[in-house]
């Protein structure tokens, strides 16, 4: 089932320097909660400055949903320490609140209890909140409070030049974009390995279902927790953040211009379902527009091609201008065993897997084959640890045992690890391979199995509160290592100044401005 990558691996072993200079970044979301686990109703902590313009700490859907962002970094340890500093400072500046350590929320009785993220009075800030109003009215607020980790990854120019020859200008844009689309196609085919190893949401609180019927065969504990005994990541299931109305868009990952055209079409395609919501009611705007996507960011995807945007530029226009610059991996649950929601083992594994995805042959995929890859993902998400579980290839009927496929993949990853260790020194990547490959013979070692044992003992709420309390105490005590207190104060002040400048620069009323941007 795993493609033959032997020639590409032999090439890599002859060109180890092609991997020198991998760049990466992390984003981590987490809900602010009270000591009893209920959602915090306070505004964004003052010490964190403006959520609209802060470089490192912002908010996602809700005012209580923090998002931490590291700068691009070539050093894993430095990046994780930077992320930890953001958590340390925040833990000391959020009063008696804690950071919820799980992907799935708990103790939220009603969607109405969730305040949307607020970004001030600038047109840009109001637009961001209106977008969230649209998300709430389309999908429900509760679903939007699910948290995850995003891992951003780019290969060095040396890799592309070694692989594609001496490239520059338009030629580089085309070839590098084609290379990243290969990564994406392989990710759709084999990325289920991420929830298998690191999925950490095998259960949900009963309140999350809000009384809605479900066809999933949940088991229920006395304290009202619903779980699937072999599930890995309910966050990635249809209960989590997926968008059924997007499944017919037919967006593919074979060609830059085709992909962008599909995305642009989706933000112009009217939706009968969303038209029923209405655009405005009693003088209050309910969504930006009633199209399938309000804006491009609404496209749900487990992985995205990205380029840093310029001021006023849409994500797709940035891609058209310069091609794909990096990849955003979006399938990581919060790691409940780490105070910062992600750890070194995961980052090193993702490095290995992304390099493998760049090397392995990846035939073009039609939208129907893309839909077929979802079958493997769903199996792993809902019953990944089930004995005897098999996986298929695309829309074909042949089936292969998951443990065997996993071990075959890791045989390749071990060779990538040896190459990365040869240029970085030590054996850190090979150690990660040895630790993780054991999960295929012993699924009890996976994150989902480990966290489910705790949840069955103490419930999701009990587990979440215990981890949140322990991490709060730990982070509040730890000294900053990279950033200093004055760096945070300076960024707070600078972010507030930037927001004020944006508000002062607006010349049009929001309604007029919105007509041009909706």
UniProtKB/Swiss-Prot annotation:
GO cellular component terms listed in the entry, alphabetical order: cytosol
Keyword Iron: no
EC class (word): ligase
GO molecular function: ATP binding; glutamate-cysteine ligase activity; metal ion binding
GO biological process: cellular response to arsenic-containing substance; cellular response to mercury ion; glutathione biosynthetic process; hyperosmotic response
Pathway: Sulfur metabolism; glutathione biosynthesis; glutathione from L-cysteine and L-glutamate: step 1/2
Enzyme Commission code(s) on record: 6.3.2.2
InterPro entries in alphabetical order: Gln_synth/guanido_kin_cat_dom, Glu_cys_ligase, Glut_cys_ligase
SUPFAM superfamilies, alphabetized: Glutamine synthetase/guanido kinase
Domain of life: Bacteria
Database matches in PANTHER family: GLUTAMATE--CYSTEINE LIGASE
Classification via NCBIfam families: glu_cys_ligase (TIGR01434)
Protein name: Glutamate--cysteine ligase
UniProt lineage: Bacteria, Pseudomonadati, Pseudomonadota, Gammaproteobacteria, Enterobacterales
């Amino acid at each position: 089932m795993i493609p033959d990558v032997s020639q590409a691996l032999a090439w890599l072993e002859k060109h180890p320097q092609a991997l020198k200079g991998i760049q990466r970044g992390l984003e981590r979301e987490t809900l602010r909660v009270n000591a009893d686990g209920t959602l915090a109703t306070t505004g964004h902590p003052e010490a964190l400055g403006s959520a609209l313009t802060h470089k490192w700490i912002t908010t996602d859907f809700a005012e209580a949903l923090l998002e931490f962002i590291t700068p691009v970094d070539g050093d894993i340890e430095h990046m994780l320490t930077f992320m930890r500093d953001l958590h340390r400072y925040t833990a000391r500046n959020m009063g008696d609140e804690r950071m919820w350590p799980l992907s799935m929320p708990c103790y939220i009785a009603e969607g109405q209890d969730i305040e949307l993220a607020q970004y001030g009075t600038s047109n840009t800030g109001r637009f961001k909140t209106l977008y969230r109003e649209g998300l709430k009215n389309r999908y429900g607020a509760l679903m939007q409070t699910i948290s995850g980790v995003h891992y951003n990854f780019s290969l060095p120019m040396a890799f592309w030049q070694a692989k594609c020859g001496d490239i520059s200008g338009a030629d580089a844009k085309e070839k590098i974009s084609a290379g990243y689309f290969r990564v994406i196609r392989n990710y759709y085919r084999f990325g289920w390995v991420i929830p298998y190893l690191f999925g950490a949401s095998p259960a949900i609180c009963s309140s999350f279902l809000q009384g809605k019927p479900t066809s999933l065969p949940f088991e229920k504990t006395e304290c009202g927790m619903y779980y699937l005994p072999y599930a890995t990541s309910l966050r990635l299931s249809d209960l989590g953040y997926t968008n059924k109305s997007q499944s017919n868009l037919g967006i593919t990952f074979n060609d830059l211009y085709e992909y962008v055209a599909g995305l642009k079409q989706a933000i112009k395609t009217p939706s009968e379902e969303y038209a029923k919501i209405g655009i405005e009611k009693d003088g209050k705007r309910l969504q930006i527009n009633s199209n399938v996507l309000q804006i491009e960011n609404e496209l749900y995807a487990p992985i995205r091609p990205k380029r840093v945007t310029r001021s006023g530029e849409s994500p797709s226009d940035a891609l058209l201008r310069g091609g794909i610059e990096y990849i955003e991996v979006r399938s990581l649950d919060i790691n409940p065993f780490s105070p910062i929601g992600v750890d070194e083992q995961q980052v090193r594994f993702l490095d290995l897997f992304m390099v493998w995805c760049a090397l392995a042959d990846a035939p073009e995929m039609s939208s129907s084959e893309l839909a077929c890859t979802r079958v493997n993902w769903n199996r792993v998400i809902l019953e990944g640890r089930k004995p005897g579980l098999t996986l298929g290839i695309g829309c074909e009927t042949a089936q292969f045992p998951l443990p065997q496929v996993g071990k075959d993949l890791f045989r390749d990853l071990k060779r990538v690890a040896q190459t990365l260790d040869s240029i970085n020194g030590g054996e850190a990547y090979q150690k990660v391979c040895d630790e993780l490959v054991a999960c295929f013979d012993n699924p009890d070692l996976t994150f989902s199995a480990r966290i489910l044992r705790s949840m069955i003992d103490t419930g999701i709420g009990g587990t979440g509160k215990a981890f949140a309390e322990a991490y709060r105490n730990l982070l509040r005590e730890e000294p900053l290592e990279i950033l200093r207190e004055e760096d945070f104060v300076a960024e707070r002040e600078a972010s507030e100044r930037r927001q004020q400048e944006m508000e002062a620069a607006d010349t049009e009323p929001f309604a007029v401005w919105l007509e041009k941007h909706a």
